[in-house]
């Protein structure tokens, strides 16, 4: 569970988030969509404690894991070693990676390869798998699909569905790819210029003129 109330984040004198409130219920998948510069990454970094807030409150129910934009792997380490780093707070879980392999079988096949030898899609799978090693109650993912082929995006999307169904893990999906995010999630928020301008059921937003005009103008092939 995530509960955010009236969150304000500033970079120097510039305000990046203006009193944002948002909630992710246990076992829920929620999308946060918006254009570049809307404040999506700032929000997830504030939720995970990377950025300080000058006002407001963030309340978490259980362990939060964060998949940052850009993957941030250790290229010289193997897939297995990168995964184990995800359980650094929970040493007893470092060898418990079979359940991650069950969600993302490709990781088991490449487990002994170095991360810098792999494709962008495989590296994104590692980043997601590493976050899951802590067995989180809440998973926040920043730009899951960025720069990835449709087949890889489909694999990762199915893994999130399976994770939510099997483990009951709540997911906050921060995405520019609105069609993907709204198709995966049950509820969604739209962020513009650091403010939540709309909250609704994901399917309602998917078929609304508001989102269609602003975020769904590209073809399904471009948006996956």
Q: What positions do the PLM features span?
A:
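The feature captures the beta-strand-to-loop junction immediately N-terminal to the Walker
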Residues: 33-35
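Conserved ABC ATPase signature
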Residues: 114-118, 122
């Amino acid at each position: 569970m995530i509960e955010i109330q009236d969150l304000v984040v500033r970079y120097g004198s510039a305000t990046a988030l203006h009193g944002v409130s948002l909630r992710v219920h246990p076992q829920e998948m929620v999308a946060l969509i918006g254009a570049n510069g809307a404040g999506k990454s700032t929000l997830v970094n504030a939720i995970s404690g990377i950025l300080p807030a000058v006002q407001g409150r963030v309340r978490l129910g259980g362990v939060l894991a964060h998949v940052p934009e850009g993957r941030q792997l250790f290229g010289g380490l193997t897939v297995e070693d990168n995964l184990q780093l995800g359980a650094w707070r929970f040493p007893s879980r470092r060898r418990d990676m079979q359940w991650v392999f069950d969600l993302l079988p490709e990781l088991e096949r490449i487990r002994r390869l170095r991360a810098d030898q792999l494709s962008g899609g495989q590296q994104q799978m590692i980043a997601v798998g590493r976050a899951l090693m802590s067995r989180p109650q809440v998973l926040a993912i920043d730009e899951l699909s960025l720069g990835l082929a449709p087949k890889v995006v489909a694999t990762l999307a199915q893994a999130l569905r399976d994770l939510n169904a099997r483990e009951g893990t709540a997911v906050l999906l921060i995405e520019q790819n609105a069609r993907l995010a709204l198709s995966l999630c049950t509820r969604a928020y739209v962020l513009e210029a650091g403010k939540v301008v709309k909250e609704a059921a994901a399917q309602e937003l998917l078929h609304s003129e508001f989102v269609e005009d602003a975020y769904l103008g590209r073809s399904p092939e471009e948006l996956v």
